[in-house]
């Protein structure tokens, strides 16, 4: 079956030539989740008011779980880390060291006020990033995020390598994506990641796939791929 998100025209997700470039910011130290959410709320409001430029914020969190608007309490199997309810879409996910989180604050009213197109754009951004490391990421119609096939684990097995969760206020996006670079994958065993309980579907990372990449390598690839989909950064 063709995933209908693959057929969405992404061309209009970028701003016209000459528009201000997106600010690209990287935090070197882990950022507490409540601090990150508060900062996103402030920045998104400022973008909506025309008082601040768009922003992509790359960071890592200390170990924690977040629950989206579709989360089921039963999907938290072992509450070994703090759990934070959040207004993003999706279910329960894990964030922690070794995972590159990218919070994306874009004015979709100026770009394209279409949530499905925006999510497809985030997926394409991740897929293009993975291509830098010769990893084939794929969309799935019934599973949000980006997946890689794992024939080494058996027929039909796939692992999730990146998660997506978004929220919009006044057509400004926040929250965003998370790519597994080298997290402790055992931390995912305490939840049903994103509500997917089928044993054929697991979680992986770039390092788990045998790629000796660093967070800095991923950041370079993320920036190049972002500019392909959403336009220039500064």
Swiss-Prot record:
Location of the protein in the cell: Cytoplasm
PROSITE patterns for this protein: BPL_LPL_CATALYTIC, LIPB
Catalytic activity: octanoyl-[ACP] + L-lysyl-[protein] = N(6)-octanoyl-L-lysyl-[protein] + holo-[ACP] + H(+)
Record has Acyltransferase as a keyword: yes
UniProt main location, coarse: cytoplasm
Stretches assigned to the BPL/LPL catalytic domain: 50-234
Catalytic residue list: 194
GO molecular function: lipoyl(octanoyl) transferase activity
GO biological process, one term: protein modification process
Similarity comment: Belongs to the LipB family.
HAMAP family in the record: LipB (MF_00013)
Further comment found in the protein's record: In the reaction, the free carboxyl group of octanoic acid is attached via an amide linkage to the epsilon-amino group of a specific lysine residue of lipoyl domains of lipoate-dependent enzymes.
UniProt name for this protein: Octanoyltransferase
Organism: Rhodopseudomonas palustris (strain BisA53)
Gene: lipB
